[in-house]
Curated annotation (Swiss-Prot):
Belongs to the methyltransferase superfamily. PrmA family. InterPro entries: Ribosomal_L11_MeTrfase_PrmA, Ribosomal_PrmA_MeTrfase, SAM-dependent_MTases_sf. One of its GO terms (biological process) is methylation. The lineage of its organism: Bacteria, Bacillati, Bacillota, Bacilli, Lactobacillales. Methylates ribosomal protein L11. GO terms for molecular function: protein-lysine N-methyltransferase activity. This is Ribosomal protein L11 methyltransferase. The gene is prmA. The keyword 4Fe-4S does not apply. Its main location: cytoplasm. Keywords: Cytoplasm, Methyltransferase, S-adenosyl-L-methionine, Transferase. It comes from Lactobacillus delbrueckii subsp. bulgaricus (strain ATCC BAA-365 / Lb-18). It catalyses: L-lysyl-[protein] + 3 S-adenosyl-L-methionine = N(6),N(6),N(6)-trimethyl-L-lysyl-[protein] + 3 S-adenosyl-L-homocysteine + 3 H(+).
């Protein structure tokens, strides 16, 4: 059996959007990304190994995004869908160039594990490290919590700046045990981080079956079996209120989430947003203000923004 492989040469700006579009809208069997920055940082991350960029084959200028589909999928239709999506993203002011799309067919056993060689330990902070389940690791700091992860088909490896901003926001907020909701959990990484940092309880929601499975399996990798999982869109059908609501999702979806926050957030609760391109920040700021929320802290990594949010108080 073979798989249809769609490769897109583009920029870091659109990685999250393409991953979400491919998985949720086009029902891709899986996605992966090759980032030039991953190789440029390799010497710093992995035992000071010297990496000659000229020795790496087919290295992208910024990002090579790859999506895999069933062999029977119409390649022309997929190319058109991705071209239309790139045009839409460019309309938001995001860099999509060069935007070149290529099509190939690969053996189904090739893609499922090849991405693992680019995914290594991430020392996020003195309190958190993200460790692939196939790697050995000794904590750098005595009280550093290790998150074991096998992201599989779900979004959220910890490599991306948006995930790291969200995790730093959680770490800042968790000064005492809190009830936490992770909206759009993906691989479950943020829910697991909250649990590791001492959350009183954690609910993880997602609309994707693959995410529900990945989150449950990754929690089990970490010996965690009490994260509540609920398949739903954002906070729809979710009962109760929380001390902390976390969402690392696209800005367009955050706009849909904002009106749901009030009925699900405790009076003195906090919200952590990530996944916001700085060009889209004004829309988020306006929507928060219109719903009586204020921004307490802005965090930035590259062009990505993370926010710590609370209710406005007169």
């Amino acid at each position: 059996m073979k798989l249809l492989e769609i490769k897109i040469e583009s920029s870091y700006d659109v990685e999250d959007a393409l991953a979400y579009f491919a998985t949720e809208d086009l029902k891709a069997l899986g996605t992966e990304a090759r980032r030039r920055s991953d190789f440029e940082q390799a010497g710093w991350l992995h035992d000071s190994t010297v990496v000659d960029m000229d020795d790496i084959p087919n290295l992208p200028d910024e990002l090579e995004f790859i999506a895999y589909f069933d062999e029977e999928t119409d390649p022309e239709e997929m190319v058109k869908c991705f071209k239309d999506k790139l045009a839409e993203l460019a309309g938001y002011g995001l860099k999509t160039a060069p935007g070149e799309i290529s099509v190939d067919y690969v053996a189904d056993q090739d893609w499922n594990t090849v991405w693992k060689k680019y995914y290594h330990v991430i020392n996020l902070s003195r309190h958190l490290a993200i460790v692939p389940e196939w790697e050995d690791y000794q904590p750098v700091f005595k009280d550093q919590e290790i998150i074991r992860l096998d992201p599989g088909l779900a979004f959220g490896t910890g490599n991306h700046q948006t995930t790291q901003l969200a995790m730093l926001g959680i770490e800042r907020a968790m000064v005492k045990p809190l009830t936490v909701a992770d909206v759009g959990t993906g691989s479950g990484i943020l829910a697991i981080a909250a649990h590791k940092l001492g959350a009183k309880s954690v609910l993880a929601t997602d609309i994707s079956d693959e995410s529900m499975t990945a989150a449950e399996e990754n929690a089990a990798l970490n010996g965690i079996y009490d994260i509540a999982l609920q398949k739903t869109s954002l906070l729809a059908d979710v009962d109760g209120k929380f001390d902390l609501i976390v969402a690392n999702i696209l800005a367009e979806i955050l706009l849909d989430l904002i009106p749901q926050l009030d009925s699900h957030l405790n009076e003195d609760g906090q919200v952590i947003f990530s996944g916001i391109d700085y060009l889209q920040l004004p829309k988020i700021e306006q929507a928060l203000a219109e719903n009586s929320f204020q921004i307490d802290l802005k965090m930035r990594a590259g062009r990505w923004i993370g926010l710590a949010i609370s209710r406005k108080h007169d």
